[in-house]
């Protein structure tokens, strides 16, 4: 049931592996480009220091092209391997974390965002909120402690409730980093 207090909203539900995985992929997409460029720089530096291997004889331009392609392919492979290792670590951490999988209720009011469960009760005041992002199926609320609050859209019972959530966020936060779907292109 939707429960409306004067200026609050309650969102009960359980966070699934699919919800957390979506946040993981949004975060990993940003850092994967960095790792790819880092591996390219490392492989280029190694090739430059050790000398370029002679893959094609007779054409320096073709040899340089082939070495560049080798660097790109190796960088892609190492980046994918690193991302796979991070994903395995992430999925194991989720499976072991009972707190993450437990049923919870998010309450947004004038105080801040309260997360209640059988095992814990957390309150994040509005001044702790540094950014809010809306993705396809989830909201990510960043906090000043470097953590984030993931609120899946399936916790909302209607579009009206989701709009009230956005209004409460806009009214109570001073952060300029609010990116709701209408703002994203």
Swiss-Prot record:
GO terms for cellular component: plasma membrane. It is found in: Cell membrane. InterPro entries: YcxB-like_C. The chain crosses the membrane at residues 31-51, 68-88. It is a multi-pass membrane protein. Pfam families: YcxB. Keywords: Cell membrane, Membrane, Transmembrane, Transmembrane helix. This is Uncharacterized protein YcxB. It comes from Bacillus subtilis (strain 168). The gene is ycxB.
